[in-house]
Amino acid sequence: MALLPDPTFYPSPGMAMQAPPERLAYVALLNVGNNGKRDAMGVVDLDPSSAEYGRLVGRVDFPRGDNELHHFGWNACSACLCPQTPHAHMERRYLIVPGIGSSRIHILDTKANPKQPKIVKVIEPEEFIKKTGYTSPHTIHCGPDGVYGSALGAANGDGPGGIFLMDANTFELKGQWEQDRGPQQLAYDFWWHLGHDAMVTSEWGTPNMVKDGLNAELLLAGKYGHKIHIWDLDKRHHLQEVDLGAEQQMVLELRPSHDPKKTYGFVGVVISLKDLSSSIWMWYREDDGKKGKWAVRKVIEIPAEPADPDKLPPLLKGFKAVPPLVSDINLSLDDRFLYVSCWGTGEFIQYDVSDPANPKKTGSVYVGGIVRRAAHPSKPKQELNGAPQMVEISRDGKRIYFTNSLYSPWDEQFYPDGVKSWMVKVDAHPKGGMTLDEKFFVEFDGLRAHQVRLEGGDASSDSYCFSDKK
């Protein structure tokens, strides 16, 4: 019998764009407060021909509700086809779900019944801290030689945060990834350029800096993250620190070009101390992407919006404005469209980044927002809070999904009336522009929706070792 790779693995991003449409979404659902409810993984029907389209069709409750589930990922993906570390026998089966609140990691098996995953392993915080030296695991990515994860801090809740490794078969923790971290202390997201043996990491804050909400004193002092770091992926050594400037606070989501030949990507900055704007920066390698130093340039700036102080939460009243608060970005597999979530204003923006140094705004929609409270077209009289936050793109780039909860302690500061959670879908137009799907509006009773993953893979789940460019 022939052994064939998992059919959801693709050598190149262009081939992945030809994949069948997704039918299910996995959504991290957070319990907030002492209401007796537990955290959960929800399963949403994405098949437009289904009678249950846009509904929660499955759910697995976690043993406890204090995890603050965050950016989960698959045990294996298209990176398993990379020739330097081939693992084509692997299958995309397990979801690795980190909790930054509890330092637990839950492993879910989706194979037997994709609509009803089963928890097959729980890594407790004591084991995680003992084996990695870190706490608050944040983001999971499947790599060519195992599962990689980021963590916000050390065992005492301060720095440094960093990267840890996990065996993709047994889910045993291997330990810290870094051999030489150089000056790096703060951590958040990470991604890589597999064709160039380069990893990029970003910065938010340590657990002690974020767990009780945004600390205005630390923010105004420029103490949150404002750098990206470049690493030798193979040797696990720090190579270069790139500082965006201390006024650029919270350098979060990283989205590299999907083409492994390229050496550029985009990173979002939550807020500028100068004017409350948010921004998107492009990182790139000088000397035509060969052996030069890495650099950054600001390519998008989104201004704050003036607002009536009476409509603002206490944290913002003195500023008389709503900052955009860019909290997530995502890049389509063809590297053409960048999507940006503005969690403050409620705007969700599409940019054409075919020329990555010169993005062009091609569309936007509004849902929620601190002041705007924009309704969904399915319920035009229902004001919504929260705003576009975690965003995921289908492999063909035609469908975009987003949820509205950021992080519980920060939800309470910016939306003190309590985030009522929802998930929406946007249809992208081939030449640019987008429209909210009026038939897709999912509400989550008593739980808050965060990260979304699409069955079979999506635009931020996989990385590729083969280019579509000849």
Where are the regions that the model predicts?
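Structural signature of eukaryotic scaffold interfaces centered on beta-propeller domains
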Residues: 2-21, 68-91, 133-144, 191-197, ...
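Beta-propeller domains
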Residues: 2-5, 17-90, 96-124, 158, 180-356, ...
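Short, conserved, GDST-rich strand-edge loop motifs in beta-rich repeat architectures
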Residues: 14, 19-20, 27-36, 82-93, ...
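Short loop/turn segments immediately following beta-strands, especially the blade-tip
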Residues: 43-52, 107-118, 168-171, 230-236, ...
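Surface-exposed loop and turn segments in beta-propeller and other repeat-based domains
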Residues: 55-76, 120-133, 176-185, 238-249, ...
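Asp-box/WD-like beta-propeller blade repeats and closely related beta-sheet repeat scaffolds
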Residues: 110-194
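Blade-level signature of beta-propeller repeat domains, shared across WD40, Kelch, NHL, RCC1
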Residues: 394-470
